[in-house]
Regions:
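A mid-sequence, solvent-exposed acidic-amphipathic segment
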Residues: 157-194
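Charged, low-complexity surface patches
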Residues: 91-92, 181, 209
Length: 253
């Protein structure tokens, strides 16, 4: 049985959660990163007997449409699947049921789900440092529990998950921009998964293409990208919702 990690991780938190979870399943796994430029996307070859861990970030209670689109290009061959929704210490709302529906429609056999925390991708003070050492231990224990269930031989039932169908309405933005510290090095343009940043003029941002994933913000060597004064407004609005430490959750069929 080969372990596949399929992650859409613009700022690194989702990938880190996936790695920690898989550390409890198997020492070695194959990672496919979906948050890359389209021409760099390399889809995995999955066999029916493999175990696939699909991890996505939560944006306002939903998962990114681009992540869904790219997962839909993966041939599942009926492989066993674990879905992981990673959120920034606010709420995951309908993300898990959306991932369940998408993965099931793609032919995966979804037998377990995890809701886990990482630093908020915009307001980094919320969930700061997560996944931390305590999360690492817990996520590894989740991985061991999942492996035990998969290898146990008992038939799987339909996984019951919290969330609503139909899903809540998604939203877009805020969109990051470059400030006066931008050196036009082009790193952001080379890393943007949608091509929203021009390589010829990295200070220009196409908001029709931008999904607000903050990939460009996380990779900028000059720390010259962000959402400006909107950060203070958003942080104040989120503070009562993100103040308390949220728990990680495991669901197994």
């Amino acid at each position: 049985m080969t372990i596949h990690q399929i992650a859409f991780s613009p700022t690194g938190g989702t990938r880190r959660v996936s790695e920690l979870l898989c550390s409890g399943i198997e020492a070695k796994s194959i990672l496919t990163e979906l948050c890359v430029k389209e021409e760099e996307l390399c889809l995995p070859s999955i066999a029916a007997g493999d175990l696939v861990v699909v991890s996505m970030p939560v944006y306002a209670g939903r998962v990114p449409a681009l992540a869904v689109e790219r997962l839909n290009a993966v041939e599942s061959n009926g492989a066993t699947c674990v879905i992981v929704a990673v959120y920034g210490n606010r709420a995951y709302e309908d993300a898990l049921v959306e991932m369940q529906d998408v993965a099931t429609a793609q032919g995966f056999n979804v037998v377990a789900a995890v809701a886990a925390n990482a630093e908020h991708s915009i307001c980094r003070m919320y969930g700061a440092g997560r996944p931390d050492a305590a999360d690492a231990r817990e996520l590894a224990s989740f991985g061991r529990a999942i492996l035990e269930r998969v290898q146990g031989g008992k038939p799987f039932g339909r996984l019951a998950l919290p969330g609503n169908r139909p899903y809540k309405q998604g939203c877009s933005g805020p969109f990051p921009v470059a400030n006066q510290d931008c050196t036009e090095c082009g790193v952001c343009a080379s890393q943007c998964p949608t091509g929203a940043i021009s390589a010829d003029n990295p200070k220009d941002n196409n908001n029709q293409l931008c999904i607000g994933c903050m990939r460009c913000v996380s990779v900028c060597p000059s720390h010259a990208r962000g959402i400006g004064e909107s950060l203070k407004v958003l942080a104040a609005r989120l503070e009562p919702l993100c103040r308390d430490r949220k728990k990680n959750e495991l669901f197994v069929s």
